[in-house]
Swiss-Prot record:
Species this chain originates from: Leptospira biflexa serovar Patoc (strain Patoc 1 / ATCC 23582 / Paris)
Binding site for glycerol: R84, E85, Y136, D246, Q247
Identification of the protein by name: Glycerol kinase
PROSITE patterns per the UniProt record, alphabetical: FGGY_KINASES_1
Keywords from the named record: ATP-binding, Glycerol metabolism, Kinase, Nucleotide-binding, Transferase
A cellular component term, taken from the record's GO annotations: cytosol
Catalysed reactions listed for this entry: glycerol + ATP = sn-glycerol 3-phosphate + ADP + H(+)
Length: 498
């Protein structure tokens, strides 16, 4: 077998694991994918099995290498990107989780957040972390586990338990339980990390009653985090040289490393990130401030708008309502409709994220009649993805005072051309889709490769960028306004907070 160096990229998403092998031009050699089980113990609760995630990650690394007919010994490095906020607590000695991973979409800690708001602690968290008090973030999830798993709090206070987001969990397992680390982008999503000092904050940990001994050491995303040890089918000693939250990974994967550059990712949720460089700023438009990556992987700030249910609404129609067998069939179904209707679908299954931040809002469909079809409901669901993203872009324009000249997009749902055209129409601006829409893991691979010298520089990577598909607005302004007005009315009807 001829020597062919490559980077392994692991994308530990919300619904499944993808693994990729990338060549020295940042192009995909091979990949593998598998979904994992979603657990819904109570309404609004979402969990994953951390052990299942680990087992499937090992299997898929092996499969991606096999699919590319590559030699495991030729892997130069591993980069990991992950669903952020999802929280795992495990035993330091055994490496066994004390409870399932509590997923970012889970709303079980809404009451904890409400109590903190009643104590007027919002600004304590906002000014240090850039975040709002919401069940979305990790801090209250950790508190819930410690308070609700028998003996967990005592064990944590004795220093016997560790916390990590999924990047930390996979790093810990890949290194044979040797490394307990995270990166700044994941740490910045916990409600416990001061994004100005880039350190865990003692005051916030005390408020949420999280022992600091549980927390991983935090580093820049481009960093030598450790080496593989005792992993099935791959050799010991492969460097793990990047960890990055999925949305910041996508921002870097799109090479939006300069202030003013933005991207929107359409995955389980939708996430619009706008690079603001070295400027720490608190939004007054319902956006959050978080950490991202600038030139050559330097930590910078960005504004983010987060939508909890994006592509997941298509999964809901597929799995729960059984409108179609495969997600890709949604586009064909919508294109079959020849008439207009007034159906509006607000997929607030996990509350509303930015810019509303309403934890108690729930999903609703308006405008149903006896002759409503699955195709019409599907169209309304796809429109909802674009309209929620419009709200993020609108908030971003108001916050920065700059019009959006174009929007770079990525993520699985961008393969739906009907959705992308409607997005361009509703934004009134050009939408640019790259050839490789898996830019979350591409960002992790870029960072891992830059750290090891496998890639020369960001400037070099820009030269390797491939062709794009562009969608330009075609909708009449009157029709666009009508769609937005219907959406705003529907949102006002599901909101519980003013």
């Amino acid at each position: 077998m001829a020597k062919k160096n490559y980077i392994i990229g692991i994308d530990a998403g919300t619904t499944g694991i993808r693994t990729f092998c990338f060549n020295d031009k940042g192009k995909v050699i091979s990949s593998a994918y598998q979904e994992f089980k979603q657990y819904y113990p109570k309404p609004g609760w979402v969990e994953h099995d951390p052990e299942e995630i680990w087992v499937k990650t090992q299997k898929l690394i092996t499969l991606a290498i096999k699919n590319g007919k590559l030699n495991p010994k030729d892997a130069v490095a591993i980069g990991i990107t992950n669903q952020r906020e999802t929280s795992v607590v495990w035993d330091k000695k055994t490496g066994k989780p004390v409870y399932n991973a509590i997923v970012w979409q889970c709303r079980r800690t809404s009451d904890i957040c409400k109590d903190l708001k009643k104590q007027s602690l919002d600004s304590n968290f906002r000014n240090k972390t850039g975040l709002v008090l919401d069940a979305y973030f990790s801090g209250t999830k950790i508190q819930w586990i410690l308070d609700n798993v028998k003996g967990a709090r005592d064990r944590a206070e004795r220093g016997d338990l560790l916390f990590g987001t999924i990047d930390t969990w996979l790093l810990y397992k890949l290194t044979g339980h040797k490394e307990h680390k995270t990166d700044h982008t994941n740490a910045s999503r916990t409600l416990l990390f001061n994004i100005q000092t880039k350190e865990w904050d003692e005051e916030l940990c005390k408020i949420l009653r999280v022992p600091m001994s549980m927390l991983p050491k935090a580093f820049n995303s481009k960093n030598l985090f450790g080496f593989t040890s005792n992993v099935k089918s791959i050799p010991d000693g492969i460097p793990i040289s990047s960890l990055v939250g999925d949305q910041q990974g996508a921002l870097f994967g799109q090479l939006c490393t300069e202030p003013g550059e933005a991207k929107n990712t359409y995955g389980t949720g939708c996430f619009l990130l706008f690079n603001v460089g070295d400027e720490f700023r608190i939004s007054n438009q319902g956006l959050i401030t978080t950490l991202a990556l600038g030139p050559e992987g330097k930590t910078v700030y960005c504004l983010e708008g987060s939508v909890f249910i994006g592509g997941a609404v298509v999964q809901f129609l597929r799995d729960n309502l059984e409108f179609f067998k495969y997600s890709k069939d949604s586009e064909k179904l919508v294109k079959s409709i020849k008439t207009k209707d007034d159906i509006v679908f607000v997929p607030a299954f996990a509350g509303l994220g930015a810019p509303h931040w309403d934890q108690e809002a729930r999903g609703a469909i308006f405008g149903l009649s006896r002759d409503t079809t699955p195709a019409q409901i599907t169209r309304a669901a796809l429109k909802a993805i674009a309209l929620q993203s419009y709200e993020l872009a609108n908030a971003m324009e108001k916050e920065t005072g700059k019009p959006l000249k174009f929007l770079r997009v990525d993520g699985g749902a961008t393969s739906n051309a009907w959705l992308m055209q409607f997005q361009a129409d509703i934004l009134g601006t050009k939408v640019i889709r790259p050839q490789n829409v898996d830019t979350t893991v591409l960002g992790a691979a870029y960072l891992a490769g830059l750290e090891r010298g496998f890639f020369k520089s960001v400037a070099h990577l820009r030269k390797e960028e491939t062709k794009t598909t562009q969608f330009t607005p075609k909708m009449k302004e009157s029709e666009r306004k009508e769609e937005i007005d219907k959406w705003n009315l529907a949102i006002s009807r599901v909101k519980t907070e003013t």
